[in-house]
Every structure is written in structure tokens, then in C-alpha cells.
Amino acid sequence: MEELFFELKQKVYEKLDINLDVSDEDLYKVIDVCIYEISQHRGLSVHNRELLRQQLYNSIKRLDILQELLEDDDITEIMINGYKDIFIEKKGRITKWNKQFESREKLEDIAQRIAAMSNKTINEAIPIVDTRLADGSRVNMVLSPIAIDGPVITIRKFYDTPIDIDRLIELGSITKEAADFLELLVKCRYNIFVSGGTGSGKTTFLNALSNFIPKDERVITIEDSAELQIQGVGNLVRLEVRKSNMECDNEVSIRDLIRSSLRMRPDRIIVGETRGEEALDMLQAMGTGHDGSLSTGHSNSSKDMLTRLRTMVLMGIDMPAEAIDRQIASAIDIIVHLKRMRDKTRKVWEITEVCGYKNNEFELVPLYKYVEEGEDKNGKIIGTLKRQNNSLKNTEKLEWSKDTGTMQCKS
């Protein structure tokens, strides 16, 4: 089949005017003619004809063998390490795919196609590009000479229907009790930071939290690459950074967007990921009347997240460390730390209240902690997110409801 595919592909190119932007309909007509001609003296089943038809179309007009992976809803991440080595993450497991691109040049061509989809350029002069596909999937591409063994393309897929908190409860990522607690905090405008390592599900969890925001609020989202899918908020402004290119320095950074958003009369600001000097602007926004703001960051623990935020602030301004720490403690109310477990599942590892800064240390109070109890026969981790013997100290935004017998947002 492989030799036949390349033979057919050559015949299709011979019949096409390669300088012409051929329509899908015309391309399929040429492909069908070529398949018919070759099937006259080769036995081809209907299944194989249809398979070759789609493979040829994908190779010429779409993203070649990548298209098959992009259309598989069970695949969450695609990792291409040169044209021969393709790895996929499917249902939490990373495996090597049994297919490869026909050549290094073909993979480079695919990288060019992906970049062109969003009017970007990738070449030896600009060997690193971050972009996204039409469906919103996030793409990072690196070409030689930076990528020694050939083009590296990493795709994190995007789903039309975002995972909500109910689905996270079903998956065992969080308990119903903890989810209800976080829903109350979001609605009552607590500033929440979601932390965790790479692949721990920070963006997914941030999106789930965002859907607790009251629908009558004005929300500004700021992202490096637009991924959030906030449902039901009509007064929503989505902002995305713009990186500089070779022609001119026209970069618009997250820091620029945070500063601009403050003049847009936001009720809340959501920053997809805080990872640089924009941390100071985010903290100032949280601490100056934009309660209920949300963001994420890379860290190994709740405490580590606060330390990393200090380092981020110092990237943009020279300030005493203690002054920065006090501002962090004043701005952030809650940290939700996520963890990707050894069985590849994602869990809320701890929910921690930031109560202040005293004696050169952050005052952190654990409210929920994941307690591991063992493994089942398949290696799946058994455990639960347990409420700790600590009450929420900052209750200024809450009041007791006599009608429901529960806490509610202060009116």
C-alpha cells in the first residue's frame, strides 16, 4: 500500500497545475481519476480505494498523516520528534505511533503549512513558533538548526466541549464537597491561583472554575494562546498576546494586556498563565478592586508557587523581597495545587488558604489535602481529597444564611 500511495501521489501531481490553488472538489476529481486508472490493472477493494483517496487528499491539501491523529478524539497530545518518531498521549498513556512522515522535507512542509494557517513564518531565521490550529489546538514548532534531529512539533489538542467541574468529579480529580467549596469562593470573589506541574491540567481546571463566575459580570481573559472556553458570560472580552516578528517590533505582551484591561472596566481578570514580569501587574490588579481574579502558574507545591511569583516580580522590577511577599500574600486568597499522578491521572493535590506574611514566611493554612491510600490491582491510585481540621480564616466576603443553613456571599 505504501508504494502504491507514492505512485498515486506522483500521478496526482502530474495531473495538477501545482501553482494553482486547486479546490477540494477538483482535487478529489483528479484523485478519483488516478485511483480508477491504477485500479484497472491492480485489484483494489472499495475499502482500500477510499483509504487511499483520503490519504492522498490529506497529504496534498491538509496535514498529511497528522490529520488522522487530529481527528481522533481520544488523543490529547501529539509529539513529533523528527519525521520518523511520533508519540501520542491517549487516555493518559504516551505511546509511539506506528506511522512516520515520508521524509524530513515533508515534515518541514507540514510545519510551514501550520504556520501559514495563522499568517506566521517559520524558517531557519525564525526557527521557533507558537501558534494554534483552526480548532484551537495549541502548537509549538522548532526547526533545525535548533532542533538537531529535525523538526519538532508538539500539539496539545483543543476540544469543542470543555471539561466542566462535574466531569472532573466523575474522573476523580476532585470531590463534590471540595468542588462546592471552590464554587462558593469563586462566586464570592476570592482571588484564586491554580498551580501545578506540566500536564497537570491547570488550564482545564481554570476553565472549570471560570464557569462558576456569575453570568452578569464583565470578564477579561488574557492568554498567551487562547484556550479558555468560558460559557454563558455575555460580557466577555478575550485578549491574546502578539509576538514580535522580523519585520518590526510589534509585540503585545501579557503585561501590556493586563495594563490595558484595567481600563476596560473589568469585574474580573483571568490570566491563563502567569510566568514572567507580568506577575506584578496581576498581583496589583488582584489587590486593587478586581477581586475574584484567577490565574495559573507552574510550581511543585502551593508554597513553591508563591516563591516563584516573587522571582517573576523581580524579573521586572527591583524591590525588596519582603515587600513583594507581602503584596503576594495580600493579593492571593486561595491556591489550588494540581498533580499528575504516577498512574497518569490528574488530581487536586491540595487547596490552601494564604492568610498573610509573618516572620519572613507565608502563612499557609491547608484546607483540603489528597490522601493516598494505595493502589488497585491495575496500578490505579486509590485515595481521596480530604477536608483538613482548619476553617477558612478570611470570611469577610461570606455570611451565614439562616434560610439555607450554609455560608453564602455577603450581600
Describe each PLM feature range.
Residues 344-411:
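NTP-binding/hydrolysis catalytic cores, primarily Walker-type P-loop NTPases
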Residues 11-18, 37-41, 59-69, 81, ...:
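Conserved, well-folded catalytic cores of nucleic-acid-processing
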